[in-house]
Amino acid sequence: MEIATEFEGVLAKLKGVDTDKLSNLSDAIKLDFYKYYKQATVGDCNIPEPYTIYYTAHAKWTAWKSLAGMAQEDAMLEYINYYKNYIIISS
């Protein structure tokens, strides 16, 4: 299966996941999902660094920025693996 197709399938499946299950994930895991999603869909971080007083925005920016140079397909694969490890297995 093509990576992009599998990635889109995972995104569609996540829309149907119980929000309680997602809220039980640690902040670190949620941040990993976020950074791989952004790298997969946008590519390298293209926004200016937020002030550190905006803790959540800065944490997201830092996480995404850490993937600079990662290929979008590689980020899709990581996202898919996170889905399989943290959503499917915990079902």
Which residues does each PLM region occupy?
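N-terminal alpha-helical modules
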Residues: 1-91
